[in-house]
Regions:
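Class I S-adenosyl-L-methionine-dependent methyltransferase catalytic core
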Residues: 1-123
């Protein structure tokens, strides 16, 4: 059985011992030698998300965990042209509390060189 291995980890703040503290827009291809893809749970605000959408898929195919409805926003149009996959995962609950989440989420796979239709996988 193949097992995924994390070969690079970073965040803008200190999280765990093996995580590098840096802005993701400063990551270079050379830093990702041996990595097959990037997987991220990015900030959802457009001012922070847009630079990541512009940069990370130029380095490696990148999976973003995002609210599912972002694909319907006009400003996402150019990015959806580079979106290979959308995999629906439904509602996520970030914290245990009495209020349940109301936002559906999906994994979006972006790649700079993608030129085909986006593939959708429902739940």
């Amino acid at each position: 059985m193949e097992v995924a291995t994390c070969k690079w980890r970073s965040d803008v703040r200190e999280t765990v011992g093996s995580s590098k503290v840096m802005d993701a827009t400063d990551i270079t291809k050379g830093m990702l030698t041996g990595c097959d893809m990037i997987i991220t749970n990015p900030p959802f605000s457009w001012g922070l998300l847009k630079p990541l959408l512009d940069h990370l898929p130029t380095l490696k195919p990148t999976w973003f965990l995002l609210p599912a409805n972002v694909m319907h926003n006009k400003r996402m149009g150019p990015y959806m042209e580079r979106c290979a996959w959308v995999i629906s995962i439904g509602r996520l609950y970030w914290m245990e509390n009495k209020v349940r989440g109301v936002d559906d989420f999906a994994w979006f796979r972006f790649h700079e060189e993608w030129e085909d239709d986006t593939r959708f996988i429902g739940r």
